[in-house]
């Protein structure tokens, strides 16, 4: 997972990627608080996300913005994530916005349940190495360039693999729009 984080950072510093970046958001997320997961894992995630310019070729889908991010778990034996997908954001009032995201996540958590382990282990069993990811966000624009938001994200294999305990995060993020 450390290699993936460094590769992600290297990609983001390349000139073509920098030219396409629309916004960056970072914050702290509660790790696995539920309600759609087991709550087995604990701690705080350090979250960083890059949001790219809208895809004009997908205007029929509402011109979503691609995003890529990382959630580095700080809890003992907690699952870290590297994710990406498409996001949509709508202004709902003068400075308020809501957003949703749909994508995939690669994680370093447990995928197989070992019958020799206790039933209530301290790691979520996620079944697959690659999971689907759904997120929702509510935010406030502090200025033309700065914003603050609360994001909830859920990662799950949707029953495709044997185990599917899922993983939730919720937290506060600050954003900077270029």
What are the residue ranges of the model-derived segments?
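Sequence/structural signature of outer-membrane beta-barrel proteins
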Residues: 31-35, 55, 69-77, 107-111, ...
